[in-house]
Amino acid sequence: MKKLLGGPGTVCGLLLRIGQCASAAASIGVMVSAKEFSVHTAFCYLIASMGLQLLWSFGLACLDVYALRGKKDLQNPILVSLFVVGDWVTAMLSLAAACSSAGVVVLYEKDIKYCNTQSQYPCLRYEVAVALSFVTWIQIAVSSHVTFWILASV
């Protein structure tokens, strides 16, 4: 198998997973700190999706640390297949959550101008949480493409 930058068991792969954890946790934190987020289903889905992403990325980051400390090779076909499926599933869920939440934010901000008339409504926090979820998705997309290409090189 090819050793690609950002693959499982590499320092770059560990940094990608840590970035995914950090941006997913930040997205959850900002969204939860906004009042009345639970009224909107898309925002609840964003929190659930980012929570799953956080758990998946944290688990793989721990596995990367284990592999790096013990000089283990994580790039065998069975493990990489698991990484590919998990990464693609979480990537699709994260993208769906980010897009649906962005749709709600655009509706309130631009279309019905609810944010202009309701000054106490936390539109900026919603926007930041959605932006962080897109950052998370970009990072998981990179990871999923790298693991896919590693699997394809078997």
UniProtKB/Swiss-Prot annotation:
- Tell me where it resides: Cell membrane
Any GO CC annotation of this UniProt entry: plasma membrane
Please state the span of the N-terminal signal peptide per the UniProt entry: none
Identify the residue ranges that face the Cytoplasmic compartment according to the record: 1-10, 64-77, 151-154
Q: Which residues cross the membrane?
A: 11-31, 43-63, 78-98, 130-150
- Which keywords describe this protein according to UniProt? Cell membrane, Membrane, Transmembrane, Transmembrane helix
- What InterPro entries does the database record attribute to this sequence? CASP_dom, CASPL-5
Which of the residues are on side Extracellular? Answer: 32-42, 99-129
Annotated membrane topology is: Multi-pass membrane protein
Quote the subunit structure annotation: Homodimer and heterodimers.
Question: In which family does this protein belong, per the annotation?
Answer: Belongs to the Casparian strip membrane proteins (CASP) family.
- Any idea what this protein is called? CASP-like protein 5B2
Q: Which organism is it from?
A: Arabidopsis thaliana (Mouse-ear cress)
